[in-house]
Regions:
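Conserved beta-strand core positions
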Residues: 234, 265-266
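Short, non-transmembrane amphipathic alpha-helical segments
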Residues: 245-265
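Helical "lid/coupling" subdomains associated with nucleotide-phosphate turnover
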Residues: 1-218, 223-234, 244, 255
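Short proline/glycine- and acidic-rich turn/helix-capping motifs at secondary-structure junctions
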Residues: 268-271
Length: 271
């Protein structure tokens, strides 16, 4: 259960606080998840929260799993660390421990950049994190890699992303291992993410899947091929020496990626 960075509208938070503030101790004891040690103080805390929100008038309320410690932790960081995005820093460190291949996340990121030229800043951060975590389930059984990657990301103790962004990242890693965009296991994330987020996750996951097929996890190979969106086509541009060496799996991965973009897959050689 990940509460960190959970966000609700301020009015919704006030409504919940006012409801709890008028409950009796007996009623609170029957509520699931309410600690018996908090029963006496919970109504007063909710009353204080309601009054605080009435004065501050914020747009939303964001939960912090670190509490007051979050500011202390931040104050102890150097300037260079403060400048880093917390999700990218987390993904970089965790991904290094999970990674099987020598293929650098930066090589994957650079290879994908032309295809995602229209992404916004949030999507750029998620794409960076996804590249670092793209080998997260290599040691799981192939039949369960998509599911395990999805579950791991949903429960990662990672800062720097909202629940919607977490859902998008989890779907991305699921699609990286499996191409079915309607898998039942994705229901929770599909409900959390909006239409743009769902589309972005499917596109990025399919492109990551293609990248690993083309490179085999070896460094330096992705730089020999290019992936481009040209009019109504998703073009995989390969050197003439590779003509005839691309198998059916590569063609299917390209077709799946093109379908995510609503484009026609085309392999161009000798360009």
């Amino acid at each position: 259960h990940i509460i960190h960075h959970y966000e609700i509208a301020a009015e919704e938070a006030r409504a919940v606080a006012r409801l709890i503030a008028v409950q009796s101790a007996r009623s609170l004891e029957k509520m699931p998840g309410v600690s018996r040690r908090r029963v006496d103080t919970l109504p007063l805390a909710c009353l204080a929260l309601d009054r605080l929100l009435a004065v501050l008038k914020p747009r939303s309320v964001v939960f912090s799993a670190f509490g007051l410690r979050e500011g202390f932790y931040y104050s102890r960081l150097g300037e260079a660390e403060r400048a880093r995005h917390p999700l990218i820093a987390f993904a970089e460190e965790q991904g290094a421990g999970w990674r099987r291949f020598d293929l650098e996340p930066s090589e994957i990121f650079d290879w994908l950049t032309p295809v995602f030229a229209s992404e916004n800043e949030t999507e750029r951060v998620l794409r960076t994190a996804a590249c670092h975590l793209s080998d997260i389930s290599w040691d799981d059984h192939p039949d369960y890699r998509a599911e395990q990657a999805y579950v791991r990301v949903l429960h990662l103790p990672a800062p720097g992303m909202s629940h919607r962004e977490r859902a998008v990242l989890a779907m991305t890693l699921a699609y990286r291992y499996k191409s079915d965009p309607r898998a039942v296991m994705l229901d929770t994330a599909l409900r959390l993410a909006d239409g743009r987020g769902r589309t972005f996750a499917r596109r990025l996951g399919a492109c990551l899947r293609l990248a690993y097929n083309l490179s085999g996890g070896a460094p330096g190979l992705l730089t020999q091929v290019r992936l481009r969106r040209v009019e109504r086509e998703l073009r995989l541009i390969v050197p003439s020496t590779a003509n005839g060496s691309l198998g059916d799996v590569t063609a299917r991965r390209l077709e799946n990626a093109a379908d995510a973009f609503d484009l026609r897959p085309v392999i161009v050689t000798g360009a």
